[in-house]
Structure formats: structure tokens, C-alpha cells
């Protein structure tokens, strides 16, 4: 049973230290990072199409080929700027099929003379070769690595956040999604090459090589364009969508090794169940006309390249995370890197959703407890401050952007208190911003529109603010009323008060009851009607909240102890007013046989009585208060 006691202050505590006031979001929203290249160069045209044609090896990161870029001019220009690593050598450039001259390439910038007016269409073709992936570490745009476990060489890309320039000329601006992308990859015939979209053809180009022609006709952010080259095999199947008979191709490029396939097949197959689940909970898989899939690479995790994730191994939560990005990150991309939560927070939370629906609630709860544990160690905000927007380690902070971001969404679900409404909100959000971008502000607008609730304080505290609350609860029962004094202290000074609901589980001699209370000040007292003798209270019993707590129950009527539930199934809770240490518990059956004898070391203490048969027993408690007897009853589970 759950009772909602609203956001009502039942007994005000007039204390000097109380915190009141509004939740000023504007203070945070003014601090927006601006790319210095954007206003001068990158805002003057829109990219509509990329066509990459590259010869690639799985043994190194050397590239040879061209990239064509189609743009529409947004305002009159005399030149175009693309971003391209200076380690790559540009050999020729054409603009609208005519050779270009006077272009400059340095400081990772390629400037091409091109006189054009607003609305003009330009097709720029850049021929280049070279190696920009050497000694760049994890965040190199292109990497060649040896998988020691599986004895495989793999070349793969990882362009997020600003490394696409390491392997093709590009406009690295999140707000400019290309309408489509073609990727042609020429590799040795014993190799395969994966990329975005549908594989339309494998063409024999002679010389012991063949060309993989990938075509994607969905809008795509620059950093989601990808390639992966290795000695692969294709393992494909269909995954059901939400509609009867609807499905999507799941195409996996895995190492061409029987032992590898047998080891991972069942985990790869989990992908199909997850696609069906997410499609039913939110909207259908966003790129269903093409595919979803994986390309294996020794990258220490995964990267959600649109329609074909690059992945190191098929662990359940990693597969769920990268798949969820197809909805949250690829279909809807964060509008700026400061709002990376739009990508990583949601993908992380859908790890929990997958566990909850496809494994067990217990596994999901364990996942959330670990996410909260990592979040407790952080002092920053989920929102990335403007001064940190170019710090890749801050943008992708695991405790903040991923784990605290997921815990935040879990609390939104709790505040809505209605799972159907939660997923309806995600459906509307996904439909509204499909093939586009969104910020946290835009997500909050949808959340408030669908729920009819005001989440401004919530975002001020949990998204833009820092830290978490600590609750200290002291409860005492008097005259059928449980008085709960709740003192909230922040973990950081950045957020002095978290206005929030919390559940309180109250266990009495007549059963359990959960009430939902609302903390509006740092210190409050709640008066809660109860029936029966209270023997235990628990803060946030289902672990919805990113909060630490301590709860103390003062026993009613001067009693030295309380027990419950009674009757019990397998376990009983024992609480002393003051635990001196050394208190003893003995339980006798009606035949006079001692069936349990233990010394109490914790307060409260849980007694495991599952070995007892159903029926009455006599419990004898011994301590500084003397010796007392209670009749207890075990009943079987219904």
C-alpha cells in the first residue's frame, strides 16, 4: 500500500538555518559555449551530404581516397572552411567539378576559395592521403589495434567529440546533420568493412581488393559516420518492432572465428529482444529502413555509430547502452556538448530498463545502486559548464554524464509516479525531435507539457546544481501518530536545499504502509497517522533517490524493544531502544525445544527464521532491561 501525502508541510519548524527561495535557471543557461570557428566560417553553409571513398587496411591507419561534401550556402561567401587534420596530405580539390586553386591547409583547417551566394549549392571533392591516427590514444579519430585475446588486427574510427577531422574533411558542428552519407571502403579481399546504412554492393575492383558500398539516407551527425575493417564474418538476423510483422535487420560484423561466434552468439541475440523492448516502450527503432548492427573492435567499450555500433564485447549492459543511443544520441542528438546528458544519461538509464524488463528487478536494482554509488563520489553538475565544454574528460565524466545522469532520469520517473506516463513522455519527446537535436531545456519542456508538473526546481537542483542530499530522520510514535523529524543537509554548498519527495516505509504490528512525503525546507516534522505499534521505518525503500539517509525510531510508550512483523513469514525485525551489546534472543517451540539462540550485535537486527515450521513460538529477550517473553507466530507465504 502507498499513501501520497503531497507536498504538505505538516508541522513547520521555525529554524534560522532553513532555506527558502526560488530556483533560478537563468543563471546557468546564460553560460553557453561558442565554437570560435562557428560564427566566422561554419555558420555560413549547411552540409547536406558526405560521400567518402577510401582505401583502408586493417593493419594501419593510412588512408587514400576522397571525400565529397555537398553544401547549401546560408549567406554570401568567398571561401569555405572544413576541418581536416594537417597530418593528411591534400592532393587536389574540385568545386562543382572544376579544379580549385589557392586553397590552404594548416592548423587542422582546410580553406577553399569558393564565391557563392545565399541558396547556392556547392559540391566539394577533396582528394587526400596520409595517416593521422598515429599515437593519438583513445580519442584518435582513427585507430588500428591488435586484439590480443582474439588475435585480430582491426582498423576503426571513433570521431566523438571532435575527431572526425582525423580521417575526412568535415564540418564538426552538432546542429548541422547531413541528410545522408555514402561510405565506400576498398579493402583486401580477405577483409570486410562495416559502416553506416545499407550495404548496397560489394564490388570487385581488381588487384585482390573489393569495395564495400554503404548507403545511409537518414540525417546523421558528423561524429556518427564510421568505418571498421577486419577479418570479419556477417552474422545477421531480424528483430521484431512494435507492429505486427514489422522487423529490422540486425547485421553483425564479428571476427571470422567459430570459437568467438559460439562464445558470443547468445549475447548478440539479446540485441533483438532489446530492439523489440525499446520499440514498444518508446518508438520503433529509428533507422528501421536500414539496419542495426555491430562491428567488433578492441576499443575498450563501445561507440554508437549510427546503424552500426563499434563494440569491444557483447556484455548485456554494453549492448543495451549502445543500442539505446540509436534513440538517444543518434536519432535525437544533444544540441551541444554541455547537454551530453541527452545522449549518455538516457543511454545509461536504458541499461537499467533492459535489466528490469529482460533480466530481473533485482539485477536492475543492483545496477542502480552502483550508479548511485559512483554519483555520490562526484561534486560537479550533470550539465557541463561552458568553461569545460572542450575538456573531453569532463564532457564524458563517467560519474556525472553517465551514472548521475541515469540516476536523475530514475528520479524523474519516480516524481511522475506513473510508468505509463513516463514512457508516453519519452514517446512524445522522441517523435517531436526525431532526426534532430535537443537540449535539456527542450526535454524539460516536453516533460512539463506531458505531465502538467513544474520541473524547474528539479533541474535547478539535480541537473545544473551539484551534490546530493543527506537525510537524518528521527521518528517517534505518540497516540496513533508517527512524528518524523526530517533534517536535510547538502553534500556541497552549491545546492543548499533539494526540494523533493521521498517515500517512507512504516512497519507496524498491523502491516506495512508506504507514505510519500515532500521536503520543502532543510528541517521539517511530519505527522503521520498509524495503526498498531511501529517497529521500523525505512527511507526510500525502493531506492529511487540519489540520497543518503540515517533513520532512528524512538520506541513508543517507553518500551525497550519492538518486534515485527508478527505473524511473520521467514524473517522478523528486532529493534531495541538502546542496544547495550550482548542482548540475547532465544526462541522455543511449544514442545519446549530451543530452536534458535543468538546474540544481537546490530540495531535493528533481522532474524532469519526460514528454518522454522509454521505455528506459534515463544521468544525470550534478555538484556539490561531484564528478561521478557513474546508469543510469535510463523505463517506460510500465500
Predicted regions and their residues:
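Short, surface-exposed loop/turn motifs with a glycine/proline- and acidic-biased composition
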Residues: 600-629, 635-638
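Beta-strand-rich binding/interaction modules
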Residues: 90-94, 471, 476-520, 526-538, ...
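Glycine/proline-rich low-complexity spacer/linker segments in large multi-domain proteins
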Residues: 39-42, 118, 127-181, 543-566
Amino acid at each position: 500500500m502507498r499513501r501520497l501525502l503531497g507536498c504538505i508541510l505538516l508541522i513547520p519548524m521555525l529554524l534560522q538555518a532553513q532555506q527558502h527561495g526560488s530556483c533560478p535557471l537563468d543563471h546557468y543557461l546564460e553560460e553557453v559555449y561558442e565554437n570560435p570557428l562557428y560564427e566566422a566560417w561554419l555558420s555560413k553553409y549547411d552540409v547536406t551530404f558526405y560521400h567518402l571513398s577510401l582505401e583502408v587496411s586493417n593493419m594501419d591507419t593510412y588512408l587514400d581516397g576522397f571525400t565529397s561534401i555537398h553544401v547549401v550556402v546560408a549567406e554570401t561567401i568567398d571561401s569555405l572552411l572544413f576541418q581536416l587534420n594537417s597530418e593528411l596530405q591534400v592532393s587536389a580539390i574540385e568545386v562543382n567539378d572544376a579544379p580549385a586553386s589557392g586553397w590552404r591547409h594548416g592548423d587542422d583547417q582546410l580553406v577553399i576559395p569558393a564565391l557563392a551566394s545565399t541558396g547556392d549549392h556547392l559540391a566539394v571533392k577533396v582528394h587526400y592521403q596520409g595517416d593521422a591516427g598515429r599515437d593519438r590514444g583513445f580519442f584518435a579519430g582513427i585507430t588500428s589495434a591488435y586484439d590480443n585475446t582474439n588475435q585480430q588486427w582491426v582498423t576503426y574510427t571513433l570521431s566523438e567529440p571532435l575527431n572526425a577531422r582525423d580521417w575526412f574533411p568535415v564540418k564538426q558542428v552538432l546542429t548541422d546533420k547531413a541528410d545522408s552519407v555514402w561510405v565506400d571502403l576498398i579493402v583486401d579481399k580477405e577483409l570486410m568493412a562495416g559502416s553506416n546504412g545499407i550495404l548496397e554492393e560489394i564490388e570487385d575492383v581488381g588487384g585482390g581488393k573489393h569495395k564495400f558500398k554503404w548507403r545511409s539516407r537518414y540525417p546523421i551527425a558528423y561524429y556518427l559516420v564510421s568505418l571498421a575493417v577486419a577479418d570479419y564474418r556477417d552474422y545477421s538476423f531480424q528483430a521484431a518492432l512494435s507492429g505486427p510483422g514489422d522487423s529490422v535487420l540486425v547485421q553483425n560484423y564479428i571476427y571470422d572465428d567459430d570459437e568467438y561466434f559460439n562464445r558470443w552468439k547468445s549475447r548478440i541475440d539479446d540485441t533483438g529482444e532489446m530492439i523489440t523492448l525499446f520499440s514498444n516502450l518508446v518508438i520503433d527503432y529509428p533507422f528501421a529502413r536500414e539496419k542495426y548492427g555491430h562491428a567488433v573492435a578492441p576499443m575498450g567499450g563501445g561507440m554508437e555509430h549510427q546503424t552500426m555500433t563499434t563494440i569491444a564485447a557483447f556484455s548485456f549492459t554494453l549492448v543495451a547502452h549502445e543500442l539505446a543511443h540509436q534513440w538517444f544520441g543518434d536519432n535525437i542528438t544533444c544540441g551541444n556538448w554541455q547537454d551530453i546528458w541527452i545522449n549518455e544519461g538516457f543511454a545509461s538509464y536504458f541499461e537499467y530498463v533492459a535489466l528490469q524488463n529482460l533480466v530481473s528487478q533485482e539485477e536492475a536494482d543492483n545496477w542502480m545502486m552502483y550508479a548511485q554509488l559512483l554519483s555520490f563520489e562526484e561534486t560537479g553538475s550533470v550539465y557541463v559548464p561552458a568553461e569545460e565544454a572542450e575538456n573531453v574528460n569532463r564532457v564524458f565524466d563517467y560519474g556525472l554524464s553517465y551514472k548521475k545522469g541515469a540516476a536523475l532520469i530514475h528520479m524523474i520517473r519516480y516524481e511522475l509516479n506513473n510508468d505509463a506516463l513516463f514512457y508516453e513522455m519519452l514517446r512524445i519527446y522522441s517523435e517531436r525531435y526525431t532526426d534532430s537535436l535537443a537540449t535539456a531545456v527542450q526535454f524539460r519542456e516536453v516533460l512539463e507539457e506531458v505531465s502538467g508538473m513544474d520541473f524547474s526546481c528539479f533541474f535547478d537542483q539535480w541537473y545544473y546544481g551539484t551534490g546530493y542530499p543527506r537525510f537524518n530522520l528521527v521518528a517517534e510514535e505518540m497516540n496513533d501518530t508517527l512524528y518524523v523529524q526530517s533534517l536535510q543537509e547538502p553534500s556541497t554548498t552549491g545546492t543548499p536545499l533539494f526540494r523533493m519527495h521521498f517515500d517512507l516505509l512504516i512497519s507496524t504490528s498491523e502491516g506495512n504502509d508506504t507514505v510519500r512525503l515532500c521536503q520543502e525546507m532543510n528541517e521539517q516534522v511530519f505527522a503521520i497517522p498509524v495503526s498498531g505499534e511501529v517497529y521500523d521505518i525505512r527511507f526510500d525503500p525502493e531506492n529511487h533517490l540519489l540520497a543518503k539517509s540515517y533513520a532512528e525510531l524512538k520506541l513508543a510508550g517507553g518500551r525497550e524493544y519492538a518486534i515485527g512483523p508478527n505473524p511473520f513469514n521467514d524473517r522478523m525485525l528486532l529493534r531495541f531502544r538502546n542496544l547495550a551489546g550482548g542482548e540475547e534472543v532465544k526462541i522455543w517451540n511449544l514442545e519446549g525445544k530451543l530452536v534458535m539462540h543468538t546474540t544481537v550485535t546490530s540495531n535493528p537486527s533481522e532474524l532469519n527464521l526460514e528454518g522454522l515450521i509454521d505455528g506459534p513460538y515463544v521468544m525470550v529477550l534478555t538484556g539490561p532491561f531484564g528478561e521478557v517473553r513474546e508469543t510469535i507466530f510463523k505463517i506460510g507465504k500465500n
